[in-house]
Each structure stands twice: as C-alpha cells, then as structure tokens.
From Swiss-Prot:
Stored PANTHER family: RNA BINDING PROTEIN
Name the UniProt record assigns to this protein: Polyadenylate-binding protein 1-A
Subunit organization: The C-terminus self-associates, interacts with dazl and interacts with the C-terminus of epabp independently of RNA. RRM 1 and RRM 2 interact with both eif4g1 and paip1, and the C-terminus also interacts with paip1. Interaction with eif4g1 is necessary for translation of mRNAs required for oocyte maturation. Interacts with the translation termination factor sup35/erf3.
Domain RRM: 11-89, 99-175, 191-268, 294-370
Function: Binds the poly(A) tail of mRNA. Prevents mRNA deadenylation and confers poly(A) stability. Binds to N6-methyladenosine (m6A)-containing mRNAs. Stimulates the translation of mRNAs to which it is bound, acting, at least in part, with dazl.
Family per similarity comment: Belongs to the polyadenylate-binding protein type-1 family.
GO biological process: mRNA processing; mRNA stabilization; negative regulation of nuclear-transcribed mRNA poly(A) tail shortening; positive regulation of nuclear-transcribed mRNA catabolic process, deadenylation-dependent decay; positive regulation of nuclear-transcribed mRNA poly(A) tail shortening; regulation of translation; regulatory ncRNA-mediated gene silencing; translation
Lineage of the organism: Eukaryota, Metazoa, Chordata, Craniata, Vertebrata
GO MF term list: eukaryotic initiation factor 4G binding; mRNA 3'-UTR binding; poly(A) binding; poly(U) RNA binding
Compartment(s) where it occurs, according to its Swiss-Prot or TrEMBL record: Cytoplasm
Residue span(s) of domain PABC: 540-617
Organism, as annotated: Xenopus laevis
Main location (coarse class): cytoplasm
NCBIfam families: PABP-1234
Length: 633
C-alpha cells in the first residue's frame, strides 16, 4: 500500500461467514468489479494458519466500498453466503449496545438475508446475524442499527409479530453481565420449587399434602413416564416467595423412605449448565493450583521403561505421588509424567535428570504445562520469529513465511484497473531445492515450485510494482522454494550436476541484519571448489547434541539432513527430497530426537506427506479454475 496515499477510514469492509478454503485471490475476483482495491486480508490462526472465517477488504474509494456492501452482501462464495458490513475498529460501538436488538423464536428457515430484508425497513443496518451451529439456525439472532431510534422502531413494530407463522420476541440487546444480574435478582424471589429423590410411589396428591402446610400452591406435579410411573422428581409452585423459601429450608435433606430428599429452587436448563460449568472450572483451577510446580514432563524415554522404572529413577529426589508412562496399544509413547509432593523436589529432579542418559537415551525433563500454556508459549515463539524476520537471502533461507495480506498498488481512479493473474500463471525464477528427489538432475536456478512448508497450506502472496504505464500486479506463488544446495543422497550425481552443486556451495553463505550499510553482494561467478564426496549414513558415528553444537550454524542442517534423508527415502523414495527439506525447518533438538525415535520420525513424515498431498490437490483444483479463463477488469 502506498504510505503517502490518503486514508479513508470508511473504505474498509468486514467480510464474515467465509468458507475455510476462501483465499485472498477469490475475494479479489469477487470484489474487484466494485472498484480499485488497496488490500485484502483473510485473518488466519497464528499457529495453524487456518482461516478464521472472516476477512477485510480495503477499497481505495469509500463509494466503491459502499457499492460492494449494497450489491454483494449475502452473495455465495464456495457454497456459503457471506456477510458484509463496515469494518468498525473501535470496539466501544459494538459493545455499547446502542442500536442493537435481540430477536428470538425464529423459524429455522430464516437466514441472515431474510432477517436483513425484514428489518432493513426500519433504518440503516450495520450488521445482521442469525446464530447457527452445525445443525443450522439456533432460533435467535441480532440486528445492529446505525441509530437507537431505528432500533426502537423495530422493537415497537416487530415484537410479537409473526415471522413464518412463528411469534417472535424482539427486544433490546442485553449483555451477559446484565442478563446474569437480572437472573440473580429473579433467583432471590423464586416461587417454584424442585423436589427429587422421593421414590417411585409418590403422586400429585401426596406431594401436595406434603408441601401444602407451607402455604397455598398454584400447581403441584410429579413427573411420570409413559406408563404413569413416577420418575422420582416433581415441582411445587407457591404463590409467595416466603412460602417457597420456608419449604426449601425445612424439607431439603429430609429422610423419605430411607432416602435423603432434595428440595431446592427450580432452575432452567441454561442456569444448571452455567452453574455446573462454574463448579467444573473451579475444580479445574484447584487442581491446577495443587499441581503447580510439582508435575514433571519427561520425554525421550526408552521403550523398555515402564511406570516402576520411571518411579525408581526419580525416587532419590523426593516423595513421588504418581509416575506414569503414556502407552498406546501396549507400547510406550516415549514420554510420561512424574508428580512430586513439593515444588522444591520437582525443581531438584529437573536440575539433576534433564539430559541424563537412562537406559540408552538422554532424558528431557521439564515442568509439565497445560495445553493453554503450551499454545501461548508457541504463539510467543512464533511472534518473536516473525519480529526477527528480515528480507531473506534466497540461498540461505528459502522458507520464509509469506505475508498474509494481498496488497494492491494505489491506482488512480482515472486509469483502468489492472488485470488479475491467478497464482502460477507468471513463472518465477527460484533456486532449486537442497534435497532433490533421487536421480533428479539439479540446476542451480531451475524453477522449483514443489517444496512447501510443513505447516498448513499458505495463501498466495501478492505484491505489486509501479511502472510508468498501466500498473499490472505481479503475482508471486505461495508455494515455498527449497534450499539451493543440491547434494543428493542416492547414487553419485553426474559430472555436470556435481559441478553445478559445487558452484552453488562455493557461494559465500552470509546473513545480513536489516539496516547494515554497504552489504556485500553475492558473487554469481562459479568458483572453483573441491567436489564433496557422497554422504554415506551407514557406519557413521551417531550425531549428538554436542557434535551438532560444535559445528558452524550453516553446517548443522546439512549434518542433520545427511542422516535424515536415507531414513525418509526408505519410507517414501519419490518424496524423500521434499520431505527432508520440509523437516529441516524444525528445531535441531527435535530433529535429533526424531533420529533417535523412529516412531516420532514416522509421525512427522506422515504429517509432511499429508501436507504435500493437500497442496497437490489444491494445485490441481487451481489449474482447473485457470483453464476456464482469466478474469479481467
């Protein structure tokens, strides 16, 4: 985006209810007829990179954004009607409740569009949504008007009206805090009493006789099954709250035919669920507090270690309350947990046992973390990595993640809009992969679009250039390119291939920090270098952490790759090169663990194969789309 261009705060649209597979390119095709677009961003999960189901489309002109809102709202993209509204960055407007109404008892057939069409007669609508789950509409929704007056008109006219033969309730939106406060106030003045655990021989008359002494009752009912047999619970509704409270105080816990009877305030289902959830969360928090700092996570366990052996190894450090090796199908999963009675004992065990060799493997010992803590830690690590990302040297690090937004250069309204070219149509020269498939002929600058990241598939990345004439966006493929070093792990390469590989390896491997002046340019002339011998994994000394740490950083991944490639080649001969390149992105400590643990390696390889297959399927689908023709402005 051109930083000098004027900003239009109301030229940004929120696009919701998106299908998981909708990309920036699809949204550009959809919205570009409305006017010049500055940027498009599909919001994604920070870790998995999966779509969160909504996006932002930033137009150059507010009039174009308004045109898109008026003409494209609820249009179908990949089988789902999308919901469009103005992007409101200030949350205070959304949370204030001004102009927001609540509608319930809706017919299942009423969707977002039908609700919008019904209420748009009362004023300008900012957002409109029917709440749905996997089974469809949940029977209620919300409409947010631009003004409070429009909301009040809608409440006056529509409350109690029939929509699709159902009488709907329309009222002012109330926050959860307001609803809970009202619920608490009503609970203090209850008149309906719930009774259970009184046996099978109870009927309405006996229950009325039992509770009638506390005051006049409006209704008494024992719940029965289809055969008329008591279900063991019932309800008594009193006229006054004082009578109901007295019945609860005196009858709760009273012995009835050898059973302790329960008498309490009758609750709605949502109240019971809320209370049970609160109790569960409290129990969970108590358990977390009790085990905070005393529960240890132990991984890289030898297959022969069981619960008793694990307890025996950690027993010298204190009192163990539990020791468990996680199993699957009768076999160890390679990790377990040890819980001590005090944090001091656990800390001592971590200090002494982390890195110690037990049986045949060095243990990894650390304080156990909850899933939420691990996710927060991973998110923090990811953000730190992203913050340190600079313009990459393609020879050194070809796996940099792409930007998650789709930016268009600012285009003057008088000019025609540039044509859109789908990903893959314009060839991009990229270095060849470091780990090529067996027998492939390497070339230092061949077009290699096959290697991708081992995470979820990334969206295509768009960048633009600004020539003097008509501006045409240049599309860069989201496929990742692999490393340029082309050493193969199979048979000895041909002379030409070996020469090409040697020439690329001879290029100095430098990384530059951002802002460094007079950066040295890479010498593109092939330099004379001695041909490296073929790597033979069999008979090599096992790679250890100390050996890896002693090696220069640029050689560490090569040492790991030399040992990973033959193992992966035995599983997937045709994909070994790509999979090796994908796995080399993982931390070195994890790669060492995979070399020692065949199960862990196979699990990661299976994940990589799944990613490759998903990527190939998406590529094939894209080719089919491209074959139908390229849309132009």
């Amino acid at each position: 985006m051109n930083p000098s261009a004027p900003s239009y705060p109301m030229a940004s649209l929120y696009v919701g209810d998106l299908h998981q597979d909708v990309t920036e390119a699809m949204l550009y095709e959809k919205f570009s007829p409305a006017g010049p677009i500055l940027s498009i961003r599909v919001c994604r999960d920070m870790i998995t990179r999966r779509s969160l189901g909504y996006a932002y489309v930033n137009f150059q002109q507010p009039a174009d954004a308004e045109r898109a809102l008026d003409t494209m709202n609820f249009d179908v993209i990949k089988g789902r009607p999308v919901r469009i509204m103005w992007s409101q960055r200030d949350p205070s407007l959304r949370k204030s409740g001004v102009g927001n109404i609540f509608i319930k008892n809706l017919d299942k057939s009423i969707d977002n569009k039908a609700l919008y069409d019904t209420f748009s007669a009362f004023g300008n609508i900012l957002s409109c949504k029917v709440v749905c789950d996997e089974n469809g509409s949940k029977g209620y929704g919300f409409v947010h008007f631009e003004t409070q007056e429009a909301a009040e008109r809608a409440i006056d006219k529509m409350n109690g009206m029939l929509l699709n033969d159902r009488k709907v309730f329309v009222g002012r939106f109330k926050s959860r805090k307001e609803r809970e406060a009202e619920l608490g106030a009503r609970a203090k003045e209850f008149t309906n009493v719930y009774i259970k655990n009184f046996g099978d021989d109870m009927n309405d008359e006996r229950l009325k006789e039992m509770f009638g002494k506390y005051g006049p009752a409006l209704s008494v009912k024992v719940m029965t099954d289809d055969n008329g047999k008591s279900k063991g619970f019932g309800f008594v509704s009193f006229e006054r709250h004082e009578d109901a409270q007295k019945a609860v105080d005196e009858m709760n816990g009273k012995d009835m035919n050898g059973k302790s009877m329960f008498v309490g305030r009758a609750q709605k289902k949502v109240e019971r669920q809320t209370e049970l959830k609160r109790k569960f969360e409290q129990m969970k928090q108590d358990r977390i507090t009790r085990y905070q700092g005393v529960n240890l996570y132990v991984k890289n366990l030898d297959d022969g270690i069981d619960d008793e052996r694990l307890r025996k190894e950690f027993l010298p450090f204190g009192t163990i309350t539990s020791a468990k090796v996680m199993m699957e199908g009768g076999r160890s999963k390679g990790f377990g947990f040890v819980c001590f009675s005090s944090p001091e004992e656990a800390t001592k065990a971590v200090t002494e046992m982390n890195g110690r060799i037990v049986a045949t493997k060095p243990l990894y010992v650390a304080l156990a973390q909850r899933k939420e803590e691990r996710q927060a830690h991973l998110t923090n690590q990811y953000m730190q990595r992203m913050a340190s990302v600079r313009v990459p040297n393609p020879v050194i690090n070809p796996y940099q993640p792409p930007p998650s937004s789709y930016f268009m250069a600012a285009i003057p309204p008088a000019q025609n809009r540039a044509a859109y070219y789908p990903p893959g149509q314009i060839a991009q020269l990229r270095p060849s992969p470091r780990w090529t498939a067996q027998g492939a002929r390497p070339h230092p600058f061949q077009n290699m679009p096959g290697a991708i990241r081992p995470t979820a598939p990334r969206p295509p990345t768009f960048s633009t250039m600004r020539p003097a004439s008509n501006q045409v966006p240049r599309v860069m493929s989201a496929q990742r390119v692999a490393n340029t070093s082309t050493q193969t792990m199979g048979p000895r390469p041909t002379t030409a291939a070996a020469a090409a590989a040697s020439a690329v390896r001879a290029v100095p491997q430098y990384k530059y920090a951002a802002g460094v002046r007079n950066q040295q340019h890479l010498n593109t002339q092939p330099q004379v270098a001695m041909q490296q011998p073929a790597v033979h994994v069999q008979g090599q000394e096992p790679l250890t952490a100390s050996m890896l740490a002693a090696a220069p950083p640029q050689e560490q991944k090569q040492m790991l790759g030399e040992r990973l490639f033959p193992l992966i080649q035995a599983m997937h001969p045709t994909l070994a090169g790509k999979i090796t390149g994908m796995l080399l992105e993982i931390d070195n400590s994890e790669l060492l663990h995979m070399l020692e643990s065949p199960e862990s390696l196979r699990s990661k390889v299976d994940e990589a194969v799944a990613v490759l297959q998903a990527h190939q399927a998406k590529e094939a689908a894209q080719k089919v789309v491209n074959a139908t023709g390229v849309p132009t402005a």
